[in-house]
């Protein structure tokens, strides 16, 4: 345990023999840094949550309360303001009972993005390092959001270390996924099992949801066989902030990448006001995708395209 760990003094004082001095709160940053250090020893002191904006509140674990960390996994190919809008709304309005203290964005690996495109030729796949950078550098992403940049294969071990470290210090921590209404609808329901969660939170902050009354006729006659009932809790956080911004998706962004002239790509006719850190993205596109007009922006069915985009 490092000397600056929030419970270092507690352990030096004698552990359980001095339980009366146990800290009621502790910064989540320390626990993430410790768990992450095993993945990347060179980044032991890498910053976790940004502190460059006003009114920053460091995510704190609270003893005796549920502490929820939401997992926002997706393609982010590329990330756009809808992602930021969804995270911001859920973090602020998820409910006091959940006590959501932070979110972790998990851009999926390049290989999974390629699988999503099926048999599409020359698909637009932004490298994970770029997608991570666009999410981290965007001022629209809330300060209590951390971007996980390691391979997906390392995620579950990282989470286990993080969870074990937090609980061993006397705190309770829960993980739940967050998705947009394109993943939870009348027709289908997102399963958070891939991320070892049994709870998910959804909001129509970024686009309308078809399960909200008044969207259209929701009752249909269907016949089928139900095999097993998975344990799943869904929390819906409705948008209550007035008129939404126009819908946008990563697919829309890729279509613009293919179709926009180089002189318009960085303007409002292109990616400005839609993609996160659009200037950084445009620079990369112009440098790395000289033949972008010939690239595929949307998946083509063939092999499995089960990796959902968010």
Where are these regions (language model features)?
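Nucleotidyltransferase catalytic core that binds NTPs
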Residues: 1-310
